[in-house]
Amino acid sequence: MIPVIALVGRPNVGKSTLFNQLTRSRDALVADYPGLTRDRKYGDGKLGEHEFIVIDTGGISGDEQGIDEKMARQSLLAIEEADVVLFLVDGRHGLNPADEMIASHLRRSNKQVSLVVNKTDGINEDIALADFYSLGFGELHPIAASHGKGVHVLIDKVMLPFAERVEEAKNQISIESRGIRIGVVGRPNVGKSTLVNRMLGEDRVVVYDMPGTTRDSVYIPYVRNDKEYTLIDTAGIRRRKHVKEAVEKFSIVKALQAIQDANVVIVVIDSHENLVEQDLHMIGYVLDAGRGVIIAINKWDGLKKDDREHIKSEVERRLGFVPYAKVHYISALHGTGVGDLYDTIESTYESCYAKWTTNRLTRILEDSIAEHQPPMVNSRRIKLRYAHQGGSNPPRIVVHGNQTDSLPGSYKRYLENKFRTVLNITGTPIIFEFKSAENPFAPKK
């Protein structure tokens, strides 16, 4: 499993700044989709060779009340789910009683804690660090998150113990999983477990939330119509004592890890509750990870015609940022529409891993330009010369030309739509990279 880093500290010590530093390289790969609001508390990070999930836990001061108290509790829960805790303090303001309160909690957590002294730029580092040795976390890590100073060194140190584990986990996943890996994610009680059971064709409630387990997701290989699949089950089912119904323990970290491990992700949405922000955030996580996405609107049976029409119009309105995702209206409980998911799983997987020749991509580019030329910039037309594939899962298409930095977003969207239509790409984002050729006659700067 990909390691999880939790950023912990009192308010205004620079957690959000460090979060942005750690997730920036991944965000840069994915366009900002109009209409999509991202939940900035969780993100995929990559620095050098290290990949990880980052949680910004929000500030904890020790005197929270009301909603702040709930947020602080969420922060403490996030610590429980993390592999590494980066405890941030402010090097300019020195030690604070809230720092000592947080330190006391972290010492009891039995987690790997690294004490990170932020905002050390422009001040005497030794003096800035001196106060914090008393917290008893051993080596201190001075950084300046706003400039990125010391961040690479910090991540190299804290991720070192996990390098071997990550490699082992990847190997284990490849051993345990066969065929297309399907992640099933969604909010609590939307019917994920029912859908998993229906897809497997058997009624099973897997208890895997036991203390001490190293992996929270269960990989279930199975065969359907002579094709192999692996379901990644994250629902976190527990049976209440003396109560028949299963109670779902929701974990955003499990969902993010499942998304990372999957080839195709089914986002399950409860039709009785309409689309809520958390549903959109979940779809956003899938897009940011570059995975194939399918939307399953569950509990469709029994809805009145008017309710169905209302939900369909809401889906059309609110999922405009992901027009290429197929939407299925299903009943996991009764099996309605579940079988139809497989055709979409197959076509989405094929789109994610498709390979195209440079010749074919360049021909599509030329046809697109013939139909609608790029605009003029400073009395010169932007020239797009050729295209080639730069990667898959998600598909990446690299377009070479002149003045590509000046290409407007509207024309990039036009190209994406043309390529998507001609190549029949469904269920996955396409990443376009535009590269400008150097002009050998341009004056040297």
Curated annotation (Swiss-Prot):
GO terms for molecular function: ATP hydrolysis activity; GTP binding; ribosome binding. GO terms for biological process: ribosome biogenesis. The keyword Ribosomal protein does not apply. Signal peptide: none annotated. Residues 354-438 form the KH-like domain. It comes from the Bacteria. PROSITE patterns: G_ENGA. Belongs to the TRAFAC class TrmE-Era-EngA-EngB-Septin-like GTPase superfamily. EngA (Der) GTPase family. Associates with the 50S ribosomal subunit. This is GTPase Der. It comes from Marinomonas sp. (strain MWYL1). The gene is der.
